Amino acid sequence: MAAHVSTGNIHNFYLAGQVYRGQAFSWSSASTFMANPFKEPSWSSGVFKALKAERCGCYSRGISPISETSKPIRAVSVSSSTKYYDFTVIGSGVAGLRYALEVAKQGTVAVITKDEPHESNTNYAQGGVSAVLCPLDSVESHMRDTMVAGAHLCDEETVRVVCTEGPERIRELIAMGASFDHGEDGNLHLAREGGHSHCRIVHAADMTGREIERALLEAVLNDPNISVFKHHFAIDLLTSQDGLNTVCHGVDTLNIKTNEVVRFISKVTLLASGGAGHIYPSTTNPLVATGDGMAMAHRAQAVISNMEFVQFHPTALADEGLPIKLQTARENAFLITEAVRGDGGILYNLGMERFMPVYDERAELAPRDVVARSIDDQLKKRNEKYVLLDISHKPREKILAHFPNIASECLKHGLDITRQPIPVVPAAHYMCGGVRAGLQGETNVLGLFVAGEVACTGLHGANRLASNSLLEALVFARRAVQPSTELMKRTRLDVCASEKWTRPVVATARLLGDEVIAKIIALTKEVRRELQEVMWKYVGIVRSTIRLTTAERKIAELEAKWETFLFEHGWEQTVVALEACEMRNLFCCAKLVVSSALARHESRGLHYMTDFPFVEESKRIPTIILPSSPTTASWSSRRLQNISSSSLIDC
């Protein structure tokens, strides 16, 4: 487990069972807090100034990796196994691509993606992007909706920034060729979704993410300063220590097609690798969402926050309720967008009783956490497998125009959504927590920026408002550009730097033998399923201290069993393989979620505890996980490479 889990705000925070009181806090080392009674910061202006100043030198300290102004470098390959770029971007969703297009104006960019470039959470996003574009709407209204949905754990400054800058980010997408739906008056058609008090969802039917991904990816592939490396799995970040400062210099990757390790050395790294939906057995996320970025950042000494807040989307398609059953199980659950309820969809149990008004006066338009818990309660009380979402009372042409993708998918399996209700069930959807970031995407690791689902910016609080995810990714990807380019211009790289870290070794038949590799892969698949079942059973929509401590114990036992098998069969600290590296990241993220959940003794937003069923004002504070100790951690929590303490500016 993480070495330290704590919660903190401007009034008090909790660390290792002790309570400290003050008005602010900052870091004095990698594992302790210091209280400062003289300032009263918000999430962004205070806590992140502490992160930025104490851990990152405010991007102006004369620490070793920062030098006088340097020129952008050309993309250099010292060998096929080492590449040098000004910027490395890990992830090819909306955050990574939008950032890459901007920083490419200043230098060379490597975009590293685990699968095909389009295979990201962005590509699966159906609903849209929320933005204040209607004269009847206002930034204040969008802010209020965001903070109410987030159970008032959101940072107000972050919320204001995102809601204010959102409309301009939409206009930029349109200028880049993204095509969104328009109404009969020629203006953008703005939909409404749960938790929103106004129509403000910009969308492209029910395939908004796919359209945004198309436009951005087309621009990226045509940019001469950007190189896209597909099928490259990010293993671990490359870091060095300068006093108390951790500095990021790039990333090691595994070329999945050639089974070779490729090292990327860069002046700036953006982590935009998405979420960790596959710690659960049913998720709307694609197979690539195994928490790689969050786990890598944690191992690299980045601060992690609010991991207990896992959003379960209330309405994923329940395949067992379809007239024509699937021949093989899906790799990820098919999402039924929030917009169906926003357009008037009604939820019924299998007895055709409408139930949402019983739980919340907002009924089907309540925030996702409320709707998911309500459905979960119905399923448990009635011992049923799914509920029904009915939109068939709306005009057929309107349904098919707004939800063509959903209609087509359901029709494949014998269900006509214009006449029949849709069977739905909650599924893991979005991580509201992640790598703690400031208003410019900065982290406590110098040279490492984050954007998108991998980040915890303070926007979502305890529950994300529908269609705020793509919005956040766009805003923070753009805000990270200026500090990134400034840092790039002040940073020089050693062309010999690649050899300053131990290189990972690929698990091959020559190294371990075919039989051993087959056994390891088989066990890893089995352990992955077991971990997912533990997370769903004990760390799902409704939790308790007993369930969480049970999960903690079972995960530790499962991880020990898996790691023991590996290392008894010739595995070593630096050995890598795709299945094993994904498993280590899933273990790491699962432990972060459980640790955070155990630290929050209240029910707030997505975190509902049966033994702490009420919101407590004194606990309206973020959960913080400090870096773990590499000497006592399991393999999933240790970096593969030895950290170099030497300067990387020898040239």
From Swiss-Prot:
Q: What happens when the gene is disrupted?
A: Embryonic lethality when homozygous.
Q: Which Gene3D superfamilies match?
A: FAD/NAD(P)-binding domain (3.50.50.60), Fumarate reductase/succinate dehydrogenase flavoprotein-like, C-terminal domain (1.20.58.100), Succinate dehydrogenase/fumarate reductase flavoprotein, catalytic domain (3.90.700.10)
Q: Which GO terms describe its biological process?
A: NAD biosynthetic process
Q: Which cofactor does it need?
A: FAD
- Residues binding FAD are 92-95, 114, 121-128, 292, 453, 469-470
Q: Where is this site: Important in orienting the L-aspartate substrate?
A: E193
Task: Give me the comment on cofactor binding.
Answer: Binds 1 FAD per subunit.
Which InterPro entries does the record associate with it?
FAD-dep_OxRdtase_2_FAD-bd (IPR003953), FAD/NAD-bd_sf (IPR036188), Fum_R/Succ_DH_flav-like_C_sf (IPR037099), Fum_Rdtase/Succ_DH_flav-like_C (IPR015939), NadB (IPR005288), Succ_DH/fumarate_Rdtase_cat_sf (IPR027477)
> Can you state which reaction this protein catalyses?
L-aspartate + O2 = iminosuccinate + H2O2
Question: Where does the UniProt entry say this protein principally localizes?
Answer: plastid
Query: Mind telling me which GO cellular component terms the entry cites?
Result: chloroplast
Which pathway is recorded for this entry? Answer: Cofactor biosynthesis; NAD(+) biosynthesis; iminoaspartate from L-aspartate (oxidase route): step 1/1
Here the transit peptide covers 1-74
Name the residues annotated as catalytic in the UniProt entry. Answer: R368 (proton donor/acceptor)
Question: Which cell locations does it reside in?
Answer: Plastid, Chloroplast
Task: Cite the entry's keywords alphabetically.
Answer: Chloroplast, FAD, Flavoprotein, Nucleotide-binding, Oxidoreductase, Plastid, Pyridine nucleotide biosynthesis, Transit peptide
Q: What Enzyme Commission number does this protein have? A: 1.4.3.16
| Comment field (misc) | The viable mutant fin4 (T-DNA insertion in the promoter) is impaired in the RBOHD-dependent pathogen-associated molecular pattern (PAMP)-induced reactive oxygen species (ROS) burst and stomatal closure.
Q: Which family does it belong to?
A: Belongs to the FAD-dependent oxidoreductase 2 family. NadB subfamily.
The entry's function note states:
Catalyzes the oxidation of L-aspartate to iminoaspartate. Can complement nadB-deficient E.coli mutant. Plays a role in stomatal immunity.
Which NCBIfam families does the entry link to? nadB
Q: What binding partners and quaternary form does the record give?
A: Interacts in vitro with QS.
Name of this chain's protein: L-aspartate oxidase, chloroplastic
